[in-house]
Amino acid sequence: MLTDNRFSVIAALPRNDLALAEAALEGGAQAVKVHCNVWHRASGNTFGTFAENRTFLRELIALCGDVPVGLVPGGEDAYINEEERLELEEMGLSFFSSYAQYVPCHMMESTRLSSMIAIGTDYTQNTLDAVRASAIDVLECSIQPGENYGTSMNYADILRYSDIAAKTAKPCVVPTQRRIRPEEVRHLAAAGCKAIMIGAVVMGGARPEDV
């Protein structure tokens, strides 16, 4: 999707709810991302285990049809195991998304799930060199510190995103850690980024009408 489209919109749902997913699809989302095993800073929500979300994930994948569905399958405290990863592959999940430091190596062995790997505030130029040489499919640029969440994007941000896209030569996704306005999205595209991932900061809530 990211290589075929000039620019794409990914919806990161603030709550695992089919009504939110349906609203995102109606709003034009070209991919949908959900979570399990994590606490999410931007939304303030805690997402349950894979077992607790199994039925929801099956229903979500069926609802989305040809629209790719991705999952954050864990974080610092818990992560899916290899058996659960294989189950997700059989369900028809399209991609997984995680910060690099939380990804078990077995996740990168999957031949059926695309990898969306996030770098954080501590990335360096050496990190970008390593990403370029890696098997990562998509790079998520989660580079804003917590105190910047919900604040306006500025041109220094654009320059950093541009540098990351150029140095890594990977399709780069920018999550809405900053409160990015619709008219600002063209600057992300001009910087070489391939998608914006709209989450809780921009949605402003966890109701279908917010999505």
Question: Where are the regions that the model predicts?
Answer:
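Catalytic cores of alpha/beta
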Residues: A19-A24, Y79-E90, D122-S134, R178-I196
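Short, well-ordered coil/turn segments that N-cap beta-strands
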Residues: N5-V9, G28-Q30, C64-V69, G92-S94, ...
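Glycine-rich phosphate-binding active-site loops on the catalytic face of alpha/beta enzymes
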Residues: A31-R41, E90-H106, L139-Y149, A189-V211
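Active-site mouth loops of central-metabolism enzymes
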Residues: L2-L20, V69-I80, S114-Y123, C172-P182, ...
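C-terminal alpha-helical cap/extension of soluble enzyme domains
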Residues: E76-Y79, P145, L159-V211
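Alpha-helix-loop-beta-strand connector modules within alpha/beta enzyme cores
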Residues: S43-G74, M107-T121, M153-R179
